[in-house]
Every structure is written in C-alpha cells, then in structure tokens.
Amino acid sequence: MERETQTYFFPDDGRIPNHPDFPLVVYQNALKDTGLAERIVTRHGWSNSWSGSVFPYHHYHSNTHEVLIALRREAVIQFGGEKGAAIPFKSGDAVVIPAGVGHKKLSSSPDFTVLGAYPGGVQYDMKTGKPNEREEAVKQIKQAALPANDPITGKREPLLEIWVK
C-alpha cells in the first residue's frame, strides 16, 4: 500500500491549547517494516525515543513536537482534546503531533505498541490542561523549534511543506 498523508487542524478548546498554526499530520502506511522505525527517525534527526502505549487521558507537550509510529497492532487515538478527532491508528501508521496538540488513547488491542520520538531529541514536558499551566504552555508552544526534517522521509516534504510558517 502507498503512503498517504492527511492533516487535521484543531482550535484551542479552552483546556487543550492545540497548535495555533500547525496541523496534525497523519501518515497512513508510513513504514512497511516497523522494526526499522527507531533507526529511521533517529537518522532523520528525531530521537529521545521510547516505546509503549499512549496515555488514556488527554495530554500534550508544550515544548516540542512528537512523532508516534504504530509498531504493533491498532488503536483509536483522540487528537485535539474532547472535541477533537478519533483517528484509527494501525501498525505502520505514523503521526506528527505539533506542540500543544492533545492526544489520548480511546481504545486499543491489548498489545498495541508505539514508538515516540522528538526533533533534536528534546526532553519533552507533560501537560494535561490544568488552568495553572496554560499561560506558560501557550508561550512555549509558539517557541517550539521547527524540526529540520520530516521524521519519516528525512526530507522537507511532506511535513515542512505542510507546516509553512
């Protein structure tokens, strides 16, 4: 199957700020061999990787963007907060989540596993939409560094062509 990309833009919902300029980018069928996922994203400048699942509550990172790649099985992930989109996510799919965009696992197969990584290996923060974290988080979202490359292709496109500032 051929790789396809879809974009989703989420406005601030009052709790989850989302990103004011950049949409979520979903890559269906991003990788044929998920065993190479960590090596690929690292080669493309995305590191500080981990593998596991996605938290079952809304959260976001204000200081960095994030790539998630489904390594095993499938899940439904909600992006953008309570009023966001529930997106099916299966082995081989990837998503680049802009700083500030909320994400939460709604359901999954028991052994669903993702790889997460960050441009330049940034140490990510964890925000859950509490009122006392909002003001600083909104500032940090706007300051999150643009990645040098798309984590899947290693080129500007498609990510950086979509994220035109």
Curated annotation (Swiss-Prot):
UniProt cross-references to InterPro entries, sorted A to Z: Cupin_1 (IPR006045), RmlC-like_jellyroll (IPR014710), RmlC_Cupin_sf (IPR011051), UCP019307_cupin (IPR014500), YjiB-like (IPR047121)
Domain Cupin type-1 positions: 28-139
Protein name in the entry: Uncharacterized protein YjlB
